[in-house]
Regions:
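A helix-centric hydrophobic-segment signal that preferentially recognizes long
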Residues: 1-184
Length: 184
């Protein structure tokens, strides 16, 4: 009788260790997603710091393009109002789209091509966009790893028991796959 009790106790201990280990692994992966999004946001902040300078440098040339500047302001406001990482991921695409449209519109203004300030800001913006792309890829990699982990048996039981949900990938806005050509 003692042997059966010890065996049952051993099985319970092993199961408890497995549950704790799995839970801790899921917590670590979930926190890694938030940490990687913070890296994306660092690059977004760099972009947000550049955008007002770019807008003010181009607004004088592009007075009739008022709607694009309003779109950019609206997208920045929506991003700033997003509370969760998943909400920010979704609203980030709106700013990307507005900024892409600004770059396309800028091609119609030859005077901008000779403006050194605008050219320098565009170079900085291009570098920032590259950094954002790298960080987004890393973010999507971490999200993918987490999502795969919570779908695998038997981890999916622990994930469901503790309320771990699938996380949202960063997806570009429709049409963003085609990069705007900017010639300054």
């Amino acid at each position: 009788m003692k042997k059966i009790g010890l065996i049952i106790l051993g099985v319970i201990a092993v199961l408890a260790l497995w549950v704790f280990s799995t839970y801790n692994s899921l917590v670590t992966k979930n926190v890694a997603i938030d940490g990687q999004w913070a890296q994306v946001e660092t690059q977004y902040q760099r972009r947000f710091d550049l955008i007002p300078n770019l807008v003010s440098s181009t607004q004088g040339f592009m007075k009739q393009e008022k709607t694009i500047f309003e779109e950019i302001a609206k997208a920045r406001t929506q991003y700033g109002g997003a509370k969760t990482v998943d909400e920010k991921v979704q609203t980030a695409g709106q700013l990307d789209g507005a900024l892409s449209r600004l770059l396309v519109i800028m091609e119609n203004y030859p005077d901008l091509k000779s403006n050194q300030t605008v050219a320098q800001l565009m170079d900085e913006l291009a570098g920032t966009e590259n950094r954002i792309a790298v960080e987004r890829k890393r973010f999507n990699d971490v999200v993918g790893d987490f999502n795969i982990t919570i779908k695998k048996v038997p981890t999916n039981m622990i994930a469901g028991m503790f309320g771990f949900k699938e996380r949202v990938f960063f997806k570009s806005e429709e049409g963003a796959q085609k990069a705007p050509k900017v010639e300054l």
